Amino acid sequence: MGSKALITSPDISSGQLYIKLPTFFHLYVWPFALFVYPYIGYVYQNKLYSEEVRYLTYIAVGTIHALFWLAGEWNTKVYCLMTCRKTDKVEQATHILVTPSKIGESSSVEPITKLVLPDSQTIQYSFSFQRKRFIYEPEKGCFANITFPMDEPSTIGTLKKSTGLTNIQSEIFLYRYGKNCFDIPIPTFGTLFKEHAVAPFFVFQIFCCVLWCLDDYWYFSLFSMFMIIALECSVVWQRQRTLTEFRTMSIKPYEIQVYRNKHWFPISTEDLLPNDVVSVLHNKEDSGLPCDLLLLSGSCVVNEAMLSGESTPLVKESIELRPEEAVIDVDELDKNAVLFGGTRVLQVTQSPFCKLKTPDNGVPAIVLRTGFETSQGSLVRTMVFSSEKVTANNRESLYFILFLLVFAIAASGYVWHVGSKTERSRYKLMLDCVMIITSVVPSELPMELSMAVNASLGALSKYYIYCTEPFRIPLSGHLDICCFDKTGTLTEEHMVVQGIAGVNRKDPYSLEKLSDASNDAILAIATAHTLVLLEQEGETPKVVGDPMEKATVENLGWSIEKKNFVSAPEGSVFYKGKVQIIRNFQFSSALKRQSSVSNVRVSGGSFKTFVSVKGAPEVIATMLREVPKDYEKIYKDYGRKGSRVLALGYKYFKNYIPENQVSDLSRESIESDLVFAGFLIFTSPLKEDARQTVQMLNNSSHRCMMITGDNPLTAVYVAEQVGIVEKPTLVLDIKHENEKILEWKSTDDTINLPMNPHKSLEASLYEKYDLCITGRALSQIINPDVIMSIFTHAWVYARVSPSQKEFMISTLKHNGYITLMCGDGTNDVGALKQAHVGVALLNASEEDMLEMQERARNQKLMGVYEKQIQLAKRFNLPTPPVPPALCHAFPPGPNNPHREKTQEGLNKVLEDLETKKASDVQLTEAEKAAERRANLANKMFDTLANASDDEAPKLKLGDASVAAPFTSKLAVVSSITNIVRQGRCTLVALVQMHKILALNCLITAYSLSVLHLDGIKFGDTQYTISGMLMSVCFYCVSRARPLETLSKERPQAGIFNTYIIGSVLGQFAIHIVTLIYITRVVYLYEDPLEKVDLEETFKPSLLNTAIYLLQLIQQVSTFAINYQGRPFREALSENKGMYYGLLGIAFVAIAGVTEFSPELNAKLQLVKMAYNFQIQLLATMVVDYAACWIIEELMKKYFRDNKPKEIVLRN
């Protein structure tokens, strides 16, 4: 059985079966137990070697044994090699090695579960990887991701006739799919700490501390070890808290009606299984749906905020009226019938044709997926199992460390060569060599990088931007292409109705009011929608649905009523009649149209069946009985002005069709032979920050493009408004309908140029014009080179389908460009997931977010206050006073003195405002702001007043969208610049850390080798003080905030390049020269030691003093010169913590040289220096700093790669 074919899943690249061996037979147990340790014992008892050799042998063997065990913890393949043996037979295997296909995810060894199935007594083999279950399929000889009944092709008719599960089926399904729950185990603190404690860098850091302890640096080593362990404990605690919060994301089980064995009865939602038929109902607890469901009958209004983050209610229609012979398509055609797990049901409407009556007046639905296989489960898995430790380019970092290792090996070789000629202890010599080699591995790098990314996450959350995959933040720092959807992204979500065109026979170009259209056109407008009336207990009924449709019906003056009735305003011919929508086909981005069937009765007349269709003009044109003369010119003319144009068609059926027969109508028969009713003209204003954001991205070396499903003329107009296109624009489209000939057209139709789909674009075309491509034209081009030529030079893509958006992003990715996609998280899911940086914009307001934050803050306060009350009761103390923020949550009284004061203050503000309004005095902006704050305070008053009656809220899904790794709760385009800003900041910090750590490591290696052999040592106090000051700088190095304006200059993306390596080596060379120079100067003032005793304890000397103070300045220059501030983030002087930390170190160094404070010098164990020597040492410090600065500036000027790629440039 080949390892590659063992698991068939796009998420897993390979797998291998293993048999776990008993503990004694593990490779890190039996060789040591049977041979190594008995031999060591024999040597020890017989004293065959010197004590020094035996001592070194014990340390070496202990280290090797530990490394044997740790190697298995670090690498799963090594673990399998040491603890298991391979097998090709699944019947024998106990474990399986799983290698994921995603870059950055680690391999995992998972146990294989064996279950005896009750129906056939066969054994089912399965394993779980990242909470995803894989089952062995004997006929295929491989493991496959668990499949659900709905994954197999099923007809609509089959699902409609579904009678639920039988007892035997439910028992089999329970074995196969398990319970419907999110089982996220929370490890204990000890378990998590053990996982962190065996991490390579942590082990390495502790190992280094132990080495320093062996070399008599106790204070410094113990202080470092304490800091490392404390930091790791804080990380473990944070991780444990995060896992606890993730666990609260699962929906609390509740009872639901299920149809099994042809009977309805209640069961817990945890016991639901695929193919169960359930009754969907709005429950009082407001719990989310327990799993993914397919609506069989009726309709629902749902809120998918927990899943997508979008709070706008959506209308879901069942598959009831779909043709029975049609095959179910939950990803496209039937997507609107899917109820996703975690979404809240706001309202259900039963169908009069439903044969399966529910006992609780709910609507029937069939279970599609359960547990972690649901859409909500997928999002939870992404959040739980996304890379927890953020790393840089691992390959580059490895090369960088290997490069530094060359210098360390040379230094340790020098120490061994010189030391072996003396009588020095081989133990100490080997210890020195190991310490030198370990000194070049920057053990602080993971911690520093993690701090930089966490700082960015925190900064983004202040803008209500949330990220589920933090490793993508550095990617946003070197973006090449930024793609934007139009509607709801660059333009506002709400549409303004301008009127209707094409209805005035004398002047078809004129724009008329909707109410001035013909009666048939008015009826078409009033019924061509999917709006419903949402009625919730205790709330005013409200209309929910597409914002554009709401705006249209409101403009017309009609109203939406219960049971899909629409009522006309007084004065209309339909005022006292009846209009009921009996069938809806929701708008589909693939089909580009929406249609409705209604039964209409004008007052006193008979019923008629009426069809209304609206959609893209070019689509509706194919359905019209007769296309008007200027049809194309009219809609293109309005499109050029930036309006959104929808064509409207209608027809009456010859015979009245009752509601119970409407399901017999096919969509094709409905959407044909239509009468043209006009063009609905909408305008969607640009978002306030759209133009400014696009301009900032253009000016900061990014290529901005628009990818939209709207028509090309409107898209080009909006692109011109925001600055995506600057030159005259040509649109590539098919020449005539139903033809494959492509043609370039100007937006005013004055230019027509042929296009060869087999030939790349000519330079003369894109140098003179900006280009727009339609989805129809793109589908005609097959040649990959031509496609890439278009993607390189086009700026606007219009009338593209969701799948085409995804194809475009993936093509750009595969050609080496770093991409960003910004969309609404609904139609753009595929493209958002494909992009390196996908950003879903949601529609919450800042006031909503502030109110939510205030509510959360007060709930935390409530928890703290309740604990205070419990403690007071336990110790018989008086009840503590209510905090001011919670005063409205408790009744007034002596224990709540703040409530009356707060109420009095609010009443006074409101009285003053009312007085001003009554006297018709114009309110100032400040007073308007005060009024808004007072209204918000009133809302908070009501919220807090009811807070004591509610349970403490738990963290739920809603911050993150299932569609994208980045989610902006606010629908502002400036979220993109905020993400780019933080990405650049993190990327700059990454490069900076590599440089600083590399220089520190090289200087340390030199100090431990050449300087150490010259008898130069540092005292414990010197190490501790400089180490503490360096810790402050390391902490602050990644805390610099980004600048508001994005610079045209791009940050250096890589690590292993001429600029970084050249700068590090150049600065290192300067430091070495100054160290050698000052050593020789010292020998002019004191004689060098004839014989250096390396084992001698530290004694202050002029050489030690000079080297220590010079190295302090070298550390200052390393941080200050390699610090990258403007134009990406605040300058060194603005990063106060680091600035003052470096000033502190410089002060210590200069004060030590000038002997400014004898007490400080005594504390630092420095000796007195001659005046001339002080001058020379100060001059050397200045030369060292200045020379390093010059090296850095020269390398930066001539070798830094900060030029944008060609695709970013307009020509």
Curated annotation (Swiss-Prot):
Residues 464-493, 688-845, 956-971 are annotated as: P-domain. ATP binds at residues 485-487, 587, 644, 710, 824-828. Residues 846-955 are annotated as: Arm-like. The active site is at 485 (4-aspartylphosphate intermediate). Residues 155-185, 250-388 are annotated as: A-domain. It is a multi-pass membrane protein. It comes from the Eukaryota. Its main location: endoplasmic reticulum. Disruption phenotype: Increased levels of intracellular calcium. Impaired ATP-dependent calcium transport in endoplasmic reticulum (ER) membranes, but up-regulated vacuolar calcium transport. Sensitive to ER stress inducers DTT and tunicamycin, which inhibit the protein disulfide bond formation and N-glycosylation, respectively, and is thus sensitive to accumulation of misfolded proteins in the ER. Stimulated calcineurin phosphatase activity. Cells conjugate to form zygotes at a lower efficiency than wild-type and they do not sporulate. GO terms for cellular component: endoplasmic reticulum; endoplasmic reticulum membrane. It catalyses: [protein]-with a C-terminal TM segment(out) + ATP + H2O = [protein]-with a C-terminal TM segment(in) + ADP + phosphate + H(+). The chain crosses the membrane at residues 24-44, 55-75, 192-212, 217-237, 398-418, 1058-1078, 1101-1121, 1137-1157, 1175-1195. Residues 1-23, 76-191, 238-397, 1079-1100, 1158-1174 are cytoplasmic. PROSITE patterns: ATPASE_E1_E2. GO terms for molecular function: ATP binding; ATP hydrolysis activity; ATPase-coupled monoatomic cation transmembrane transporter activity; membrane protein dislocase activity; metal ion binding; P-type ion transporter activity. Mg(2+) binds at residues 485, 487, 824. GO terms for biological process: cell division; extraction of mislocalized protein from ER membrane; intracellular calcium ion homeostasis; protein transport; sporulation resulting in formation of a cellular spore; transmembrane transport. Residues 45-54, 213-216, 419-1057, 1122-1136, 1196-1211 are lumenal. Disulfide bonds: none annotated. Its EC number is 7.4.2.-. It is an enzyme of class 7 (translocase). Endoplasmic reticulum translocase required to remove mitochondrial transmembrane proteins mistargeted to the endoplasmic reticulum. Acts as a dislocase that mediates the ATP-dependent extraction of mislocalized mitochondrial transmembrane proteins from the endoplasmic reticulum membrane. Specifically binds mitochondrial tail-anchored transmembrane proteins: has an atypically large substrate-binding pocket that recognizes and binds moderately hydrophobic transmembranes with short hydrophilic lumenal domains. Involved in controlling nuclear calcium ion levels. Contains a large substrate-binding pocket that recognizes alpha-helical transmembranes, which alternately faces the endoplasmic reticulum lumen and cytosol, while remaining accessible to the lipid bilayer through a lateral opening. The translocase alternates between two conformations: inward-open (E1) and outward-open (E2) states. Undergoes a series of conformational changes with ATP-binding, phosphorylation of the Asp active site and subsequent dephosphorylation in a Post-Albers cycle (i.e., E1 -> E1-ATP -> E1P-ADP -> E1P -> E2P -> E2-Pi -> E1). Belongs to the cation transport ATPase (P-type) (TC 3.A.3) family. Type V subfamily. NCBIfam families: ATPase_P-type, P-ATPase-V. This is Endoplasmic reticulum transmembrane helix translocase. It comes from Schizosaccharomyces pombe (strain 972 / ATCC 24843). The lineage of its organism: Eukaryota, Fungi, Dikarya, Ascomycota, Taphrinomycotina.
